[in-house]
Amino acid sequence: MRESDDHPEFVHAFNAYTPPATIEGDLVYVHYARVEDLRKLKTDLGMDLKGKICMARYGKIFRGNKVKNCQDAGAIGVILFSDPGDIALLGTEPENVYPNTIFLPGSGIQRGGTGIPLQKGDPMSPGWPSVKNAYRLSPEDLKDLGSLPKIPAQPIG
C-alpha cells in the first residue's frame, strides 16, 4: 500500500487468529488449497511445500481450512486472494461493483477468522460461557489442539 492510499478509517487487511510473523520463502500457487489441490501438487508435479509460502484463492472451502492444509503440508505462510472471476461477475468497472452492485471492487479485501473452532462461540471458552472470570484455554492450548493456525496468513486484494 502506498502512503497516499492510507486513510485513518481504513481497516487494514488481516486474518484473525493467525500469528504475527515476518517470513521469506518461495511463493507457490495452490489453487483453493484443498487437500486434493495440495495432493495434486505433490503427486503429479513433485512439489514439496515445506518452507514455501502458499498463495490460495478464496472459495470452495473455509479460509481456516486452507491455512491448516498448507500448514500440514509444511508451508510457512499463506497469502489469500479474491479472484475477480469469483467476486466481480459483471466485471471490475466501477458501475459493476459495490456500491452500484453487490460485487467486490478491485480495492476490496476479504477479511475473517482462520481459527477452526472446537465448538461454536469464543474459541478460548469452547462449550462454556465466555464471561468474566471464566476458565479460558490459552492460545498455546488452542494451537496444540489444532484450533488456531501456527503459520501466518495474509489476505490481499
Protein language model regions, located:
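N-terminal leader/propeptide and maturation segments of large enzyme subunits in energy/redox metabolism
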Residues: 121, 126-156
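Non-catalytic positions within long, well-ordered alpha-helices that form the structural scaffold/packing
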Residues: 71-74
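Solvent-exposed, acidic/flexible segments
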Residues: 56, 60-63, 149, 153-154
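Protein/peptide-recognition domains central to ubiquitin and immune signaling
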Residues: 1-3, 64-67, 80, 89-99, ...
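Noncatalytic luminal/extracellular "stalk/propeptide" segments of secretory-pathway proteins
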Residues: 1-53, 58-60, 82-85, 96-129
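Generic recognition of flexible, low-complexity loop/linker segments
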Residues: 16-17, 41-44, 65-68, 140-141, ...
